[in-house]
Amino acid sequence: MNINATLLGQAIAFAVFVWFCMKYVWPPLLAAIEDRQKKISDGLTQAERAGKDLELAQAKASEKLKEAKVQAAEIIEQANKRRNQIVEAAKTEAETERQKIIAQGEAEVEVDRNRVREELRLKVSALAIAGAEKIIKRSIDKEANSDIIDKLVAEL
């Protein structure tokens, strides 16, 4: 056997093998590799997009939370104002009612005072007349001396 012929046969077999691989094996491998690279690239792009969407969603959620807190604070403030208004209105109404009751009580006291004063004047004038009758031992004619009695009542 000749080494050159063997080497030449092996070289031809290798060339045929390389040509066969380049023609039938290499294109599907390249297609699979490119497809895999594309899938990985798309996955990374989607991951980046998802990360950005997540950040955006978190920012929106944070903004909504801030708005809700502000709105809650406003509602609480309005409720406190309304409560204060109701309390002030109740205080004002109670003060008005108190003043009315005091005025009514003072009016009743004044009426009772005037009534008692008038009763006292009448009793004092009756006692004065009785005392005067006993002192001078004679009866005073009420109709004739009504001037004296009226002056006496007015002085008391």
From Swiss-Prot:
Keyword Cell membrane among record annotations: yes
Pfam families: ATP-synt_B
GO CC annotation, single: plasma membrane
Protein location: Cell inner membrane
InterPro entries xrefs: ATP_synth_B-like_membr_sf, ATP_synth_b/b'su_bac/chlpt, ATP_synth_F0_bsu_bac, ATP_synthase_B_chain
Family: Belongs to the ATPase B chain family.
Protein name, per record: ATP synthase subunit b
Annotated source species: Psychromonas ingrahamii (strain DSM 17664 / CCUG 51855 / 37)
